[in-house]
Amino acid sequence: MNTIVGMGEALWDVLPEGKKIGGAPANFAYHVSQFGFDSRVVSAVGRDADGQEILDVFAQKKLTCQIEQVDYPTGTVQVTLDAVGVPCYEIKEGVAWDNIPFTDDLKRLALSTRAVCFGSLAQRSPVSRATIQRFLDTMPDGEDQIKIFDINLRQGFYTKEILCESMRRCNILKINDEELVTISRIFGYPGIDLQDKCWILLAKYNLKMLILTCGTNGSYVFTPGVVSYQDT
């Protein structure tokens, strides 16, 4: 019961210089595997060339997958650069990772999962949202279980309900300073400093840990009663 899962979007980032595999959950699972842990990617791809190529790349990297092929196109993100070189992202909707099914195999995986990392982006659709929430609810209860919510606020693909339900189910929250400002506005406490907001979230959702990244200004790790800081 030591499997570590990255659950959510698996897609192609289509860049000006070509395409590369993207998706935070897949990236998480890959890096975990490089430390020798039993990791899995849970997602969905289409029955198309893009989907098969994702499966082939993961196989080449020896990354274990539980990826369903569904009757929707494989997800893509069109990445363009504006006049000053700032990237702009167009995340396609109605794609495979919006339709991750909850299967018997996925239920068995949930029962043997020690840690899972999930985000808000893959919950923009009702199908994948229900699957992710059901997976989290199926995992065994226990102090050793780790449920990491890596908030990923993109293109307005989130609601207060999605954020509340995700934070209620997680025990570790990873968030950046810009996302924290957005979350604070949604929940109605914008007038206090970033650290105070973190303490509020830690207590409100009974979190084991909250990780706040602040770009070039370093990172903070909050646990009940203790905060640590690391330079970038």
Regions found by a protein language model. Give the residues of each.
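Glycine-rich phosphate/adenosyl-contacting loop at the front of the ribokinase-like
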Residues: 1-63, 77
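Conserved phosphate-binding/catalytic region of the ribokinase-like
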Residues: 2, 191-232
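Residues that scaffold the ATP/ADP-binding catalytic core of kinase and kinase-like folds
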Residues: 14, 66, 90, 183, ...
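Short, conserved phosphate/pyrophosphate- and ester-handling motifs at nucleotide-, phospho-/glycolipid
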Residues: 32, 176, 213
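Conserved N-terminal subdomain of the carbohydrate kinase-like
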Residues: 38-120, 141-145
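Structural alpha-helical scaffold elements that stabilize or flank donor/cofactor-binding regions
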Residues: 108-109, 165-166, 203
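Conserved beta-alpha-beta core of the PfkB/ribokinase-like small-molecule kinase fold
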Residues: 115, 120-200, 217-219
